[in-house]
Amino acid sequence: MALHEPPSKLNRHSHSNLLKPPSLNKPILTFADNDCLKTPTMNDMLKTPTVNSPRHTPMNIDGTPKVNGFSGFTPQTDQKFFGEHEPLFNQMHTTTLMPAPSSSYKEPAYSSEQPSSSSDEAKPKELLGSNSFGVPRMTNGNSKQKPEELTLKDIEISSTGPGGVDSPGLSAAMFQFSPMVEHFLQNLTNKAGLPELVVDSKTAGLNHQEPSDLIKSVQVRRSSIEDQKFSDVLHVPTLPRKTSEPSHLGSSLQNEHPQSNSRPSTVIPRVQRTNTSASLTRSMDHSSMSPISAHDDPYSNSASYSSLSTHTSFSDSASLAHFEPKTEPMDDYSYNFSDNDFNSFEFSSTSEELKNIGCQKMKSSKMPLQDRPYKCPRDGCDRRFSRSDELTRHIRIHTGQKPFQCRICMRAFSRSDHLTTHVRTHTGEKPFSCDICGRKFARSDERKRHTKVHKTSRSGS
């Protein structure tokens, strides 16, 4: 619109000429036809940019420079409204859908030319009214309109965006915001579908499994490893646990059965029980094949690997319960032994179990009964011990309990020192070394037996 030069001073008649038709030019109190006392109707709101603008009419002071089109509370001679000019209607329509960001900057040229406080109060209310109802403001031509291509682009973007995400039937294009807010909303509208695309492309590109599939695969892999460990334990045959009374134990030679589980509560000593009427000669024949040392073996003390048949007395030489030594220590500790070591190991001494069985009276004579106050509570077992921990280890032989389990191969042991020695077979630790030749061993009894080899070689030479 054309900018009209503000008159230098408005008199009473010229001011009323701008506001009312010529027929109503009379006193100054009737120049607005009492519009300030009327409640604005819908037609008034549609015809005027702001709803509350007629109230400011009597507060204007004569002599205040007024700009045509700025305080348009009444129709001006060069002002157009809805339907009167088609291009203006189209511009209003596009601006209502996506208002121009320059709406917040209004009348920069004449902001300093209005010293009146009433005119200053009219400006924010006009802004409020136009922002609330989306009615186009009549500018004086100084404020720049938003380019048409940008407006069309914004409308197109908002139409392609996910309409109805925040509120069904409403869109951000129906409201007017500041340029910064419009820029932020445009970024959100353009990137609305980006998260799903990023997740889908990442999943497709990296070929990741779902979290549930990963958990299932880990569980399957773990179960397969445990099955493999348990299957390795199955290679060592064991005896089924016997929970019957002692009179039902060991009447004939028991066959070894593989145990399906090697946990401490189910695994029993891997020994064979022979006939209880076996002779002492047969027992000593088996003792010559024993791979366990007599005194220095940590596996063989007064409580280890004793008889499981507790219905007979150890002092009775007529009925002896014999243990066939397990081959497991040979498998665990013999990988660095030579043939000479094996020969000397097999035939140099008898096991502690057989010595306790065959020489019970001699051992009892060595240690008085008062020095062995702990007696085995099992019926038929006359074993006595000087310490309570020895009795505890001895009772595990009757019950078959093995509370110490190897975490590598899941093998169980009845004593902690047995487990410690067994773990060295996995780690390769050899803390014991020969003082003569420097050879290292994992067990102290192995080193002692090796030292005897040096002594015999010196005595023979």
UniProtKB/Swiss-Prot annotation:
| GO molecular function annotation | DNA-binding transcription factor activity, RNA polymerase II-specific; RNA polymerase II cis-regulatory region sequence-specific DNA binding; zinc ion binding
Organism's domain of life?
Answer: Eukaryota
Q: Where is the composition biased (Low complexity)?
A: 299-308
List the residue ranges of the region (Disordered). Answer: 1-25, 96-152, 232-308
Compositionally biased region (Polar residues): 96-105, 129-144, 249-265, 272-291
Residue intervals of every C2H2-type zinc finger in the record: 374-398, 404-426, 432-454
Places the protein is found? Nucleus; Cytoplasm, Perinuclear region
Query: Could you tell me in which tissues this protein is expressed?
Result: Expressed in sheath cells and distal tip cells of the somatic gonad, as well as in the intestine and sperm (at protein level). Expression not observed in oocytes (at protein level).
Keyword hit for Zinc-finger: yes
Q: Which UniProt keywords apply?
A: Cytoplasm, DNA-binding, Metal-binding, Nucleus, Repeat, Transcription, Transcription regulation, Zinc, Zinc-finger
Name of the protein in question: Early growth response factor homolog 1
Q: Which organism is it from?
A: Caenorhabditis elegans
Q: Which gene encodes it?
A: egrh-1
